[in-house]
Every structure is written in structure tokens, then in C-alpha cells.
Amino acid sequence: MNLASALSLGSEKYGISSRRVLLVDMDPKGNVATTFGVDKRTVGPTMNELFSRGVDSSSLRLEDCTLGPDFLTGSMKASWRKSNPGKSRGPPNHIAVRNLWVLPADMDLSGIEVDLATRVGRENRLKLALSEAMDSFDVIIIDTPASLGLLTVNALCAAEWVLIPIQAEFYALEGMGQLISAI
């Protein structure tokens, strides 16, 4: 999430221009949306709907499921107000999202692996779902669960590059080795 935010903002100081970034949450915990103060119970279609019917149905498009910069900014400011009751001033002006869209996930996504198990081409569902977004974004970052299930396999099949953030501990290193072997 930090990487997505940094890329979307760029840096005038270092001559790095901002990028249009899509941050895809493939983790059923849905922490990406939570990070931006989004109440997952109030958003429309999520990754689960896109997986379960979106690829097979022309009625649901990727843009129907994404949360844009204005929505994310509003959610962050509302979250700030909720966390700071009674403050006379409003949220800081620097709470603003630019050039960043989020494709949220929720707990319903955890059941999709069972559904995917019987489908032909199950490993390419995310790649197909994201194909329409390729020209709209400079960078697409996919946040995966810490497992080697079909959600992670879909992310790996859709990705051109893989970045593996880990904690400096034995079990994380062991898991990274398993992931590298799977790739």
C-alpha cells in the first residue's frame, strides 16, 4: 500500500512523475480498503463479485468495482473525523488521494477458491479481469494473501514482476522459499 501511494504521488524533488496506480486486494481480510478508512460493508461490488461473475458477464466491469481517488479521500477524511471527535478543525489538508484506485476485497473472497477449483482456466481469472485495465493504469499492484492458494496463483499469472515483502524471521524466509519454488 505504501508503494502504491508513493508511485501515485511521485516526487518533484527527485524528478519522479506521478503514476496512475490500481491497487488490487486479493486478500480476503480486505486490509487494503481498511487502510484507506473504507467501510467494506458499504462499498459496491468487490473482488469476489468480479471473480464469481464479472469475467463471465458483461454486466459487471472492472470500473464498477474500483474505488477512485475522490472516494478514498472522502473515506480517509471520514475516518479521521471518527478518530478525532470533538476537534474544532477538520482533517489535515494533506489527507488526499491522487492517481490511485483500489479494487477492494472482503471476506466473501475466501470462498472463491472452492468455486475456482472446478473451472477451466482458473489460474487466469484475474489476468482476464484486469485485461481491460491495462491501458488505463501505468502500474497495477496486486496485494496477495500469505498463502499459495488459487488467489495467489491468479496474482502470479497476472503479474509481470513479483515483489515479496517479508519480515526478517525464520518462518517468513521459509515461506518465501516456497513461493519462489512455486514461481
Describe the residue ranges of each PLM region.
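P-loop NTP-binding core
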Residues: 1-183
